[in-house]
Amino acid sequence: MKRNLPISFLFLVTMFIVMRWQGTGLITPQSPKGVLDLEFAKTPERFHQLQLFWNHKKVLQNIYLDFLFIVAYTWFLITACKAADNTKSNLFSGFAISAGAFNVLENFLMILVWNGRFEPSLLQIVYYASAIKFLLAGIVVGYLILSLFGLFKRESSH
């Protein structure tokens, strides 16, 4: 397990760099946050504004690459939770898996919306799936930071 932590971290950093590099074309004056602007585009008007300025193919490439990023951050967060080796590790590993699952849902819905299978209600679901994903991932990161300071009981030795 300890060997997986640096490997999963390297995979995470690699995917983060790839996503930033590939997503630079999505950063415009109308979308300073790149693909995050699509994730949080609650209204059809905002969605259509993004469509005007973005390359259709680059958006889809970014979303498809995000599936690898999901694997990377979920693997890293689970591995880090297990490395924390305390009584809450399994709970927070579950939160990491849930964050990844919400991200997968969000990506599938964004693909549907971006490809013209558009229902305004889908934007609301994408918005909330994205918000829940970030909340869960933030909770896990917070847990990991607190674990570094020993604020959770260690697992008893078997």
Indicate residue ranges for each PLM-predicted region.
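Hydrophobic alpha-helical transmembrane segments
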Residues: 58-80, 141
